[in-house]
Amino acid sequence: MALTQRANLTPGVTVSFLHALWLAAALLLLTGTARAAQFTVSGPSGSGEFGRSVATLPNGNLVVSDPLFDAPGPIVDVGAVHLYRPNGGRISSLRGSSANDRVGSGGIVVLPNGSYLVRSPSWRNGAAVSAGAVTFVSASSGISGEVSASNSLVGSTAGDQVGSSGITVLSNGNYVIVSPAWDNGTAVDAGAVTFGSGTSGVSGAVSAVNSLVGSSELDQVGREGVTALSNGNYVVSSRAWDNGALVDVGAATFGNGATGSRGVVSAANSLVGGSGSDQVGYCCVIALANGNYLVQSPFWRSGSATEAGALTFGSGSTGVQGVVSSANSLVGQSPSDWVGYQVGLLSNGNYVVINPFWSNAGVFKVGAVTFGSGTTGVSGFVSEANSLIGGKAFDSVGEEGIAVLATGNYVVRSPGWDNAEFENVGAVTFGSGTSGISGLVSPLNSLVGSAAGDRAGSAGVTALANGNYVVRSPFWRLGTVAEAGAATFGSGSSGISGAISPANSLVGSTALDRVGSGDVVALGNGNYVVVSPEWDSGSTSNVGAVSFGLGTSGHSGSVSASNSVVGTRQDDRVGAQGVTALSNGNYVIASAGWDSDTTSDAGAATFATGAAGISGVISSANSLVGSRAGDRVGGFGVTPLANGNYVVRSPEWDNGAIVDAGAATFGHGATGISGAVSAANSLVGGAANDRVSADGVSALANGSYVVVSAGWDNGGTSNAGAVTLGLFNGSVTGAISTANSVQGTVANQAASHRFSYDPVRNQLAVGQPASNRVVLHRPGIATSLSIVGDTPDPSAVGEPVLFSATLLASQNAITDGRVSFTASSGESCVDATPTATAANVAEFSCTLVFNAPGSVSVVAEYTGSLIHAYSGSAAETHSTVQVQVFANGFEGP
C-alpha cells in the first residue's frame, strides 16, 4: 500500500519515471530504511562562526561565511567568506586584515549569472574604522586574499559603512550598492549609491566619479532604497536630501541600468520638492510592470496647504526631473490630504491612487480613489471629476485599499462609508481597469451594508483566479441578528451593487457567526472557500464552518452542514488555523481545536477537492487527526508543495507518552491523507518538547521540502536542532536520524542553523556556526567518484580527449544516474549510461575537445540517481599543446 501511494505522488509524471521510482523504493526496502550520505566541511583554522550563512550558486558551488574568523596572530574577527565545490572541496577564501573587519557579516548577494557579492560594512580601511566594503566574486574561481580597494568597493572615512543599506539587483543582472552613511568630505552622511557591473563588478573608493552622491550633511542619498525597474533601469529615493537652504525637500533620481548614475543629486537629474520637509520619495518609488514608475510624496506642500501630498509619474526610459507640481503630479489641495500615501497596481499595468485622508472643500476626510494610466500617468488636483469620492466626513473612501482582479479591473473597500441613515454601513465599489470610476459612492455603483456598523468589505476582498471576486463582511447584520456575517460573490467584469442580503451572499444565521471572518481563500481553478471559525451550529457555539463556492456563480443562503464542512463540538473552530490552497486546485483545512469523540483539541487537517469541496462533519475518515488531548494537529498550518502535495505541521503532537514530540506529515495532493498521525506516516520527534516542524517547513521548487525543528534533542544535548530534507514522494517518515536529517551538536544553538538546497545534486547544505561546520546531506546510498583517465594527456589543440571516471557505491549495483565532466575553461560532456565493472562499481566516460593550448582543471560529478547519492571528484589537471606542422610534414610542439 505504501509503495502504491508513493508511486503516484506527482500528477503528470511519465510512466518510465514512476517505474524507476517503484524500483528505487523497492531497493531501499530490500536494503533497509532509506539512506543518506553526509559529508562534513569543517571550518579552517581560526574559524569562529563558520556557516553563519550558506548560499548555493547556480553552478552548484557553495558560498560559506565566517564573520568571526581570526587571522594568524591572532587578529580577531577579521572575518572570511569561502567558496567550495559541491563536493566540499575549497576553491578560495576571502578575508579581512584588521580586527573586527568581520568580512561577510552583511551577508551574501547572489547575482543572476552566479557571481556573488560579499557585504562587509565593518571593514576597516587603514585608520578609517567601519569604512565598509562590497566585494564582487566569480562563481567559478572565487577570490582569495584580503579585502582591499583593488578588489572591492570601499569607503574612505570612518563610519562610511559602504553597502550597509543593502544591494539592489537589477533585472539585467547589474546591481546598485546603497551607502547612506558615506561622507562627502566634511558633509557627514551625505550618502552614496554606486552602480556595479554584473559581469565585472566595481572596485575602488566611493566618490562622485563612480557614484550618485549627496552634497549636504545628512542628505543620506539612497536611504529610502533603490527601486529596480522591469527594463533594467532604477530609481534612487532620498527623502532627506537638501536643496541648498531648503532642508529635507527630498529627491528621486533616475539611473541608467546599463551605465549607472553618477555625480551630485540635483534638480537637473532628479525629481525634487519645492519646500522644506516635502520629503519627495518619502516612502517608496513604485515600479510599474511596463518599466515606468511612481514617486510617493505624501508630505509635499501645495502652496499654504502642508502635507497635501503628491504622486508623480516617471518614464522608465528617461525618468522625471524638476520640481514636483500639479503639472507633473496628482496632488492634494488641503492640509493633510496625504495624496500618494497608498497606491494599488492593476494587473494590466495601470494603477490606482488611494487617498482616504482627502478632504473635499472643507468636508473632512471623505476620501478619494483616483485612476492612473500606466503609460501616461495622471496629474492635477484630486477631485470628484477624476476620482471616486465619499459624500460625508470620515467616509474615508479607499481606507482599506483595493483588490486587484485578474481581469485588470479593481474593487475599492470603504467600510467607513455612511449612507443617508446610518454610519459605517460600508461600501465596496467596482472600477474599470482601463478608465477607472469617478463620482460619489452610492448603492447604485457599490455593494453596501444596510445597518450601522455593517462595515461592508471590512475583512477584505478576495480576487479569484478567473477574475471574479468575493467580499467579506463579518460584521453584517441579518435583521435582528448582529454580526451574522456575509460573503458576497461579485463579477469581475461588471461588479455587484445594492445591499448585501441572503439572496446574493452566503450568510450566518446566529449572532456572532461572523461568516467569512477567517478568510476567503481563492483556489487555483477559480473556485473559492469561505472560512467561518466562529459559526454556531444551533446552540453549540464556535463549531466553525468552511464553505465551498463556485467561482462562476458564487454561493448564497445560510451556512449549514449540508453546504459546508463543520465541527460538532463547542470551540472546534473549524478552519481557524487556515485553509491552504494547493497548486492543483485542491485545498486543506487546518482545525487544531477540533475534538474527537474522546479527545479534546486532537486537531484535524482535512483534504478537499477544488472541484466539489467537502461538506458534513470532520472525522478521522476524512481528515488527518491527533490521538491525544492537545495534539492540535495542523496547529502550525499546512505548507503547500510545488508539485501539488502538502505537509501538515503539528509540533504539539504527542508520540505516545512523549509530550510535544511533534510531527510533520506529508499529504498527497490528489487524495489527501486521513487517520491518526503516527511514525508510520510522519516525521516525528522522539523526546519531550522536540516539537518537530515548529520552526518551519520550506517548500522547494522540485516538490521536496525542508523541515526545521530547533527544539529537537540530540540524545543528551537539548535543543540541538535538526534540519530535515523531505523528499517529493513523501518517503521521509519515522524518527529524525542522520538518514533524513542534519543534526545539531551544540545545545540551544539551533536557531543559528542556515540551509541551502541544490536541486541538481539533491544536496542540502546546512551551516552550523556554533559547531564551525557545514554538513552536506545527500539522500541515497553513499558513493565516491574518481577521474581515472584522460587520454591522451597532453593532447593537441582540437584533439578529442576521452575522460573516464569510476563510481564506487557502498551498496547496490549502479544502474542509473549520469556523470558530467566540466573543465575550468568551460567545456563539458555527459555520460548517462553507467557501465558496471564490479558489483557496486560503474564506469562513465565521454569526450572533451580543447581548442586552446594550456592547462585546465577538470572535475566530474555524479547526479540524477533515484537510488544513489551525489558525489563529486577531485580536480584533474589536463594539458593541451599547440601542434605545428613543419615543411617536411612532421608535427612538433
Regions found by a protein language model. Give the residues of each.
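Intrinsically disordered, low-complexity segments enriched in proline/serine/threonine
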Residues: 7, 13, 46, 60, ...
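N-terminal secretory signal peptides that target proteins for export/translocation
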Residues: 1-17
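Conserved beta-strand/short-helix segments
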Residues: 30-780
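Short hotspots in intrinsically disordered terminal tails
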Residues: 12, 31, 889-891
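Solvent-exposed beta-strand/loop surfaces, strongest in extracytoplasmic domains of secreted
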Residues: 779-892
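Selective for proline/serine-rich intrinsically disordered segments
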Residues: 9, 65, 110, 178, ...
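Bacterial N-terminal signal peptides
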Residues: 16-31
